[in-house]
């Protein structure tokens, strides 16, 4: 079985994403966000767009959305997804760093098994302000209106929080669910 690729967008938690997947016995490899899309398409069964400081340092990561593979965008990965598909981001009114209670508005395969409210760990200043056409807003919080979104037809999923850190309650479930999506 092909691995998942974790795209390094220069964020503080990208290596932790990789480590979490490997600790879960999910085969995963980290790649640069400058890896040619054709190479990515041949080498994996799903993509995790990790976090990072700015869209300007996202390399060619937005091109990976067009490969027909399932994609999970985390933090900056969500922003890459939103802007590449016609949405918008902005500086959040308060930003988020620390524990946040997220409310799930709509269940889907990525969020399967989670309760309607859950504690997550946030570490961001920007947020999605306009959800792209074809996407559904799945979750929000008091500090961020779009905590999760998805385009089910394209198998594109984005979350603002960090499931890879221990402060997110049951964060590994999200990776299990994404691995299942990539194995379908």
From Swiss-Prot:
Record's catalysed reaction(s): XMP + L-glutamine + ATP + H2O = GMP + L-glutamate + AMP + diphosphate + 2 H(+)
CDD domains: GATase1_GMP_Synthase
Database matches in InterPro entries: Class_I_gatase-like, GATASE, GMP_synth_GATase, GMP_synthase_A
Catalytic site positions: 75, 162, 164
Molecular function as annotated in GO: ATP binding; GMP synthase activity
Assigned keywords, A-Z: ATP-binding, Glutamine amidotransferase, GMP biosynthesis, Ligase, Nucleotide-binding, Purine biosynthesis
Pathway: Purine metabolism; GMP biosynthesis; GMP from XMP (L-Gln route): step 1/1
Function: Catalyzes the synthesis of GMP from XMP.
Protein name in UniProt: GMP synthase [glutamine-hydrolyzing] subunit A
Gene: guaAA
